[in-house]
Amino acid sequence: LNEPYKLNYEISGEDKKKKKQDLLNKMWRNQCINDTYEPGSTFKVVTATAALENNVVTLDSRFSCPGFRIVDDRKIRCHKTTGHGAETFLQGTMNSCNPVFIDVGLKVGVKKFYKELDKLGLLQKTGIDIPGEAGTIIHQIKNVGNVELATMSFGQSFQITPVQYL
């Protein structure tokens, strides 16, 4: 049933060799270092760290969530489409509220946000002694506008490896 060396169907010759090699490569692929992903809401702790360390917010800073935030010409939604209403930064963090983190990310600003990413080692490979480590896929700082920063603040529009995020 689950034998990676056996094919489910009959092929022959070069196709068989290629398919077998593809299966072996897939079986031995280390997704923790070879693949990147958007960290999503788990990344909000990084944005929170940047905001708190730069004194941009306190735990009691007040925000409002109507279920979305308009950034430039884009409507970016919260997972709670009816909104969380009035909330503090601490409550917004507990609610994993995208509009709160959009506001916070924009207050932190691009330069400080990238400085925090660099400080945490998220802009370069870890240097782990395992072959095939992928690197961060992220906008160049000069190309980051409000929309990009807004979505990055809650872990979208860039990619890192799981090992980088440890």
Per-region residue spans from a language model:
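Beta-lactam-recognizing serine transpeptidase/beta-lactamase-like catalytic domain environment
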Residues: 1-41, 46-166
